[in-house]
Amino acid sequence: MTSPDQVTRPADTTRISDTALIFEGGGMRASLTSGMVVTLLNAGLAFDWVAGISAGASNAVNYLSGDARRARRSFVDFAADEQFGGLRYFARGQGMFNAEYIYQQAGGPDQALPFDWESFQSSTGDMRIIAFDAVTGDDVVWSRKDTPHIEDLMIRVRASSTMPGLMPPVHLGGHVYVDGAMGEGGGIALSQAQREGFEKFVIVLTQERSYRKVPQRFPAVYRSMFRRYPALGEALLTRWKRYNETRERIFALEAEGKAHVFAPERMPVDNGTRDLSRLAAAHRMGLSQSRRELPAMREFLGVDGTS
């Protein structure tokens, strides 16, 4: 009997040039959407333009490297690593998630979660990783030209994934960066794809269709917490509105036949889940749902099912 996590190799690949592939963030909720990464790779669907924010940035670079096993391990098995994070690391100032280890150490050769840099470099798809400048309140958008070396890539994935208050901000090139979900799309790079001319989208969400974000309680607490970075404090307090508006635009595009949307039928984990059995179950759910929805996605993309 075939394991639901088994990785297969496609007979060939189909390049998709007219459609943007967009991965939402969501911390460990990406354990479920990493199942979509596996399905896309096994199906041989090679998108020429891929964007990700926060945990979606990890899904994006794992997809571009063609590493289905790493896609799963990043959000399932790796959570058991004793250096992954926790209160001990938070107390030391390293973050509830030990970001330097996760993004800048574990991905090296012979490390806990090696990243296939050669395969990433040889892949044809371009990428967009988005982070938020905590000082100016602006988004920064990085592409392949900004990442000539693996170290350049991984620190940018880390910056995009840096949850304010839970992980230390990333200092890079004289700027202070945090999670790209604080930016204009609330964590979904739809506007960036539209600015670059795309009119068709495959969008991988990490919340159920019925989900709506609500305003943060106790705004004065957040403004005080981030008083060094007032633009960040305001962005965090208003994120709910930008996020909900972006999702409304996404579902409108879907109704117009311009977007194929993957939204979890049920999301069994939250952004901080570390329980391996729950994370593995979430991954299997994402794998199963994405496989069931693959024919509809192929039809949307205008490709047959032979690859």
Task: For the regions a language model picked out, list residue spans one by one.
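Patatin-like phospholipase
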Residues: 1-53, 61-307
